[in-house]
Amino acid sequence: MAGSPGPGSDQVAAAVRLGETLGITTWAGVVGVSFGGMHALEWHVAEQGRAERVAVVAAPWATTAEQLATNTMQTEIVKLDPDFRDGFYLRFGTRPRAGLALARQVGMLQYRARDEFNERFGRVRQDVDEGPYAVESYFRANGVKFAESFDANSFITLSGAKSSHDIGRGRGSPERALQSSPAPLLVVGIESDRLFPLAQQRFIARHSPGSVSGHEPVVLPSGHGHDSFLIDQAWMSRTLGEFLC
């Protein structure tokens, strides 16, 4: 069953301990995107001196109320699937595929941009005039694919970890936390991101003395929403490469 999610700071601390066990005490760079960007920001603040430079891409300084609500809703959807069985589904030879697929579809609403959905699918139906809308088929197919490849308890645990993210927790304030680290920091935001809007990366850049782009983040000018970092790979490779080299 799903365990306690634990804050992202615990997960970063575990990664640091693993590195020490392997004999790695200093990292040339730490790069994180989305949830990984939350981890990268924690490296930047909590593990100063361990990474020579850090890149935070499409991630917030803290999870907002809207994001908390979405994470909670997705978790509840999974748990409402009768096959979830209080998290002990493997004992019964089942998996909450329907709940996990629907939770994924909810998340996808924020992973892509609104205009992209309209331009890509519009109100076109799939195959025949009375068939499902193309966007319905797209969401269902992606939900099913995700449910077949991802574990429900892992999904719940990771959702809880994302919800716990707050770089200012226990450090006085987010501003104080960010200002404490002078290490080179690349902050990248996505122009059309609905999941973690550009204002969140702007806050990080403005309060980070090591921000390599000053008080504004580097902006990926893409209309694909949060998933732009997966699509515009040439831009991402060039931007990250220039920072890390």
Report the location of each language-model feature:
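Conserved acidic catalytic loop of the alpha/beta-hydrolase fold
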Residues: 9-29, 38
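Short glycine-enriched nucleophile-adjacent loop
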Residues: 37-48, 54
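Active-site nucleophile elbow and catalytic-triad environment of alpha/beta-hydrolase enzymes
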Residues: 141-142, 157-177
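Catalytic active-site module of serine/aspartate enzymes centered on a nucleophile-bearing elbow/loop
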Residues: 202-205, 211-245
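Short alpha-helix in the alpha/beta-hydrolase fold that links the catalytic acid
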Residues: 170-175, 183, 197-207
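Short beta-strand/loop motif that positions the catalytic acidic residue
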Residues: 181, 187-189
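Acidic catalytic loop of the alpha/beta-hydrolase fold
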Residues: 145, 164-166, 191-196
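Alpha/beta-hydrolase-fold enzymes
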Residues: 50-52, 56-145
